[in-house]
Each structure stands twice: as C-alpha cells, then as structure tokens.
Amino acid sequence: METANDKTNVQGIKEDPELILINISGADRPGVTAALTAILAQYDAMVLDIGQADIHHTLSLGILFRTTSSVSGEIMKDLLFKAYDLQVKI
C-alpha cells in the first residue's frame, strides 16, 4: 500500500522515507548550525525540529529531519566529515 510519503526516484525505484535524529555537542561557535543544516539542504532533507542549548559555551544541538533511504547514508557521511571539521561530535 503506497502512502503520500512514498517517493519514486528517477530510475523508478521506490524510496522509503526515514526519520533521523542527530545530536551534536561541542564548543559553541558561530556557523555550526548553519554548516550542518546546509548539508541537509543539499539533499532536500526536511528539518522537522531543532532544539539547542548553550551552557557555558558548550553546544548541545538536536536536529530531527526526514529524508529517503537512498540518500540517508550520504547525508550522515557528509555530516560526520563536517562535524570533524567543526570539531564537534555527532
């Protein structure tokens, strides 16, 4: 049974939707959230919720997003590399 969330890619392969929650922690600096959400935008991931706390210049950030199974691995790979560059942990 197909639902409104089911998508078919250009090759005609059905893509399953995935909800992913990532938790980011580390030193808070300008641009961390922007850099990570820019990656989500590159893959047309839909950000569903963001929660953030900054305690004594330490960032705790949670991002819930929806994507498809065909690109979720690539998104996570790119997020992990960017997190390494930004010196934060996912």
Residue ranges with predicted function:
Residues 2-90:
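A conserved regulatory-domain signal marking ACT and ACT-like small-molecule sensing domains
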